[in-house]
Amino acid sequence: MGTVTIQLSCLRHIRKLCFSCPWEGRRLFKMLLQFHHETQRPLDPGCLLPQDAERSADQPGRAVVDFPVAAVLPAGGSGERMGLTTPKQFCSIFNRPLISYTIQAFERLPWIVMVVVVVAKDNHDLMLNIVRKFNHTKVKVVHGGTTRHRSIYNGLQAFSDSTDSSTPKPKVVIIHDAVRPFVEEDLLLKITLAAKEQGASGAIRPLVSTVIATTSESYLDHSLERAKYRASEMPQGFLYDIIFQAYQRCSEFDLEFGTECLHLALQYCGTNARLIEGPPTLWKVTYKRDLAAAEAIIKETLSVSACIIAEAEEEAVELAKTLQKNLNMMETDVIPCGKESNVQYLSKTRNFIHISASASSSLWVLEMVKCFEDIDHARLYPVVIVWVQLSMTKQSADSQETDEFMALASEVKQRNVLLYGIKIDHSKELEQWQRSLERLGQITLVLIRDRNMALTGQMLHV
């Protein structure tokens, strides 16, 4: 394929590729903005990036978790409401199943010692492959039951086997849905400490709609006063002995038709749960539109920063500084070429912009990808490299060069690195040059934010 020219009017179209239709895209975007305004902070899908977990090491209260904590993730659902043949927990975002994101939200915390994932027997091998591929080191996979409560009970029983030293009994166990990947450490800490003190705890959210009861003839019977009620959410925490005993004592009817773990602890052990207000990001991926919203949140989180690498030419350095100003919506660092192999810079972000002002070898791309592999930087999330080539004189596209770039992009894509190219012609006309610089910033931002795999290997021309 030849050089692709992208007009400014196309940028909005590229940005919406993750949504099924423009109307739905606008609705989801408004929903994300609502999350942002309610929390009064940047959108945060549960500290998805590993460096966030490292920064959290100094958070107040961490030291008080001096007892073993484990998690049980029921993941045996069929995803009927999603309307897909693949269960929703195994639907992929960036070629990575949703359940892997949820597992990481727990694994990244050093005070969580074990994550038991409960899956249907038919999905056992699939889950084991996910654990191996994404290097989940704290996970034990067990078979689920025919209902949600039976699956949770199976997960809890994994800790009761005294002969299995690899799964020691925890003091506190957290039960969480496999399709709620956006759970933050702060909430998990509150749930854990409240469970240790009270015996049981759970996250709640305000009701967004009024709940009504209907008659058998489908007439209104009565409605509940919304202000008095809350929606029960996940995660929920328990002293292990309490919740395990509750499941041992509960009836077959509870196991078959029940859905609320807090109710079992209250009814069969007399333990009244402490309820904790959760953030708006606790929502559950249930429908196709939720999967699109989850992808949008992950993209937003991965796009907060970038590293601009400038080659030695004066023109490249100046272009790097200008691009940094135009990318003011992101945190950016400008470093000279040669330092990109420094782990300090590689581990800070998953977005890299390489600027050259003369014909240069593409070997640096392979060297950079090798560095990513050495620090396991691209296993969980795709890394973006935007190669900006500044031409001081207008040149026509070279088909051999274009083919080589596409082949290189295809090679590194197998290692979860997304390579894009942008050619920008320098103009002596100030107004035209300013327009080109503006388009360069806009296209670069879109490529980083959208992470569209279909555009890898394309050399865009501004």
UniProtKB/Swiss-Prot annotation:
The keyword Nucleotidyltransferase applies. Its main location: cytoplasm. This is D-ribitol-5-phosphate cytidylyltransferase. Its EC number is 2.7.7.40. GO terms for molecular function: cytidylyltransferase activity; D-ribitol-5-phosphate cytidylyltransferase activity; protein homodimerization activity. Pathway: Protein modification; protein glycosylation. Keywords: Cytoplasm, Nucleotidyltransferase, Transferase. It is found in: Cytoplasm, Cytosol. Cytidylyltransferase required for protein O-linked mannosylation. Catalyzes the formation of CDP-ribitol nucleotide sugar from D-ribitol 5-phosphate. CDP-ribitol is a substrate of FKTN during the biosynthesis of the phosphorylated O-mannosyl trisaccharide (N-acetylgalactosamine-beta-3-N-acetylglucosamine-beta-4-(phosphate-6-)mannose), a carbohydrate structure present in alpha-dystroglycan (DAG1), which is required for binding laminin G-like domain-containing extracellular proteins with high affinity. GO terms for cellular component: cytosol. Pfam families: IspD, ISPD_C. Belongs to the IspD/TarI cytidylyltransferase family. IspD subfamily. Disulfide bonds: none annotated. One of its GO terms (biological process) is muscle cell development. The keyword Cytoplasm applies. It catalyses: D-ribitol 5-phosphate + CTP + H(+) = CDP-L-ribitol + diphosphate; D-ribose 5-phosphate + CTP + H(+) = CDP-D-ribose + diphosphate; D-ribulose 5-phosphate + CTP + H(+) = CDP-D-ribulose + diphosphate. The gene is crppa. Disruption phenotype: Hydrocephalus and incomplete brain folding by 48 hours post fertilization (h.p.f.), as well as significantly reduced eye size reminiscent of microphthalmia in patients suffering of muscular dystrophy-dystroglycanopathy congenital with brain and eye anomalies in human. Gene3D superfamilies: Spore Coat Polysaccharide Biosynthesis Protein SpsA, Chain A (3.90.550.10). Homodimer. Transmembrane segments: none annotated. The record marks R81, K88 as: Transition state stabilizer. SUPFAM superfamilies: Nucleotide-diphospho-sugar transferases.
